Amino acid sequence: MFLRTCVLALTVLGTTVSAFGQSTFTASLQAAAAQTANQPAAESVRRLSIDEAVNLALEQNLGIRIQRIDPQIQDVGIAQARSFWAPNLQTNFSKNSQTQQPTSSLAGGATNILNSNINTALGVNQTLPWGAQYAATWNSSRFTTTNQFQSFSPQIGSNLNLQYSQPLLRNFEIDQIRQQVANSKKSRELSDIQLQGVITQTLRNVRNAYWDLSYSINNLKAQQESLALSQQSLRDNQKRVEIGTMAPIDIVQAQAEVASNEERVIVAEANIKAAQDNLRALILDPGSADFWSVSFEPTDAPAFTAQAIDVDAAVRNALDKRSDLASAKNSLEQSDINIKYYRNQIKPDVNANVTYITTAAGGTLLSPVDFAAIATGAPINRTIVSQRGFGSVLGDVVQSQYPNWTVGITVGYPLGSNVSQANLARVRLQYEQAQTQLKNLQLQVATQVRNAARNVQTNQQRVASARASRELQERKLEAEEKKMAAGMGQTFFVFQAQRDLSLARTAEIQAISDYNKSLVDFEAVQLVPLGGGGGFITTAGSGTLQVGGITRQ
């Protein structure tokens, strides 16, 4: 490696400096080289453009994957709320047998009376989307008995019962089910807003992580160039000591400068690994086999192209498209729904009710009991007068041969204050509070956009200043090296110029990287709050909604 080569070169050249100082410096370089050599090399290097990084994040980022499930959860919530409108089918079958002990001569049996009854029922009931409720029930029965005085045995009965109830005031425009359905739809819209916000925030983080990695790599190159300059100065000074134009003590300063630059290289290499991990976590699937072994080589270099910034247009765009503002407006819409519901609940409970019942009976009709014959002690002898089967009975029910109907209105009104009035007062105050919070959030958004625009403009100026500083430092170092070569300079000033140039190069690289990141932030701040924050908007009647995040109650 490069460090090992430096150690070997220094060993071959040798110097006339003290054995103690030379051996200490060489040992430190060897230790640093050994540490670098022992680090595991990356198994694979992947060339990556910034657009490819964005596409990978859209496919594999865990945060986006998590948020993509939320709209599906909200779809289930809408279906759950709508399920209260689903019809409910009910069936029933029962059989009853009863044996009675006769307690009088007119009980209808000598020793006991056996009654047997079979009942079946089929019904459907439903709450309708406009607040009404209906129920339809069909019943049938078959009754047999040993009672001698019973007119029918067996007796068949059937009836159809229809009921309908329609709210006229309370629960007419909106009821609890319609409130839940409407709020569930708004929650579904909110999940889409939050998903788009998470995607935008993640892509912003990916782009910034990409530029951070690019900066770390360029910074390492700058530190390596500084190290190479200091090593060249060390070699030049060693030659001057050999020919007697420089004191041996000046070698120590050169060695110290090399060691200091070596430390900066080590730190720069560690920063690259940290930047690699940060980008890796944003764009790769942790379940992939090469998650930790692959490293990235950015193919897009951070460029500096001055761009005009229209702050007013950006503020207008943010006020129209910011996810936290959209979430806040969504919460106000939910508050409107809740206010409408509670305003309706303070109205009188007036319902129109209609009931329609049609019945029919049949079976085997027996002749009347001859009580005169019974008085003489003759046995009871009854004959079949007529028979009507189940089909005839069902026909009577369908044709409404024996109808029974009822139409009525029920009115209910609580005396004194009630819970609905308190709820309405509460949600109105919360709605007013939420409107003020929205105005405050709009002010925060405008401030954030202006700050982001100011950062872009500041970084533009930083790049120009840092570039000019780097060019001047290059000229300064060149002048000091010429003076040193002519025997008119000092080692201290050469090393100072090298350090200044290194700092200037790092500052220029940092300024260009910060400029590109500020452009990313300026675009993102018009869509999402930077840092995933945001305000809190109170949703009247349903708790608190975090704006700009993904927390709801």
Feature names for model-found ranges:
Residues S23-N117, Y164-Q179, N183-K185, Y210, ...:
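Bacterial Sec-pathway N-terminal export signals of envelope proteins
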Residues L114-T120, I156-L160, P403-W405:
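Residues that define the transmembrane beta-barrel architecture of outer-membrane proteins
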Residues A81, I193-A313, N455, N459, ...:
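Periplasmic alpha-helical coiled-coil/stalk elements that build and connect Gram-negative outer-membrane
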Residues L3-A9, A19-Q22, T99, L279, ...:
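Acidic, low-complexity, intrinsically disordered peripheral segments
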Residues T91-S97, A136-R142, A352-T358:
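Transmembrane beta-barrel strands of outer-membrane/channel proteins
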Residues R65-I69, R82-S83, P129-G157, L169-I193, ...:
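Sec/SRP-type N-terminal targeting helices
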